[in-house]
UniProtKB/Swiss-Prot annotation:
The gene is rpmJ. Disulfide bonds: none annotated. This is Large ribosomal subunit protein bL36. GO terms for molecular function: structural constituent of ribosome. It comes from the Bacteria. It comes from Corynebacterium jeikeium (strain K411). Keywords: Ribonucleoprotein, Ribosomal protein. Pfam families: Ribosomal_L36.
Length: 40
């Protein structure tokens, strides 16, 4: 999982979901797991 300042480019990938957990924003992608990221 990467920690990124901006998730905009990742959320446009096919299969990406934006999720809020414990006050943090995550992008999870079951199709391409290397695009997992947290905003921070």
């Amino acid at each position: 999982m990467k920690v990124r300042k901006s998730l905009r480019s990742l959320k446009n990938k096919p299969g990406a979901q934006v999720v809020r957990r414990r006050g943090k924003v995550y992008v999870i992608n079951k199709k391409e797991p290397r695009f997992k990221a947290r905003q921070g």
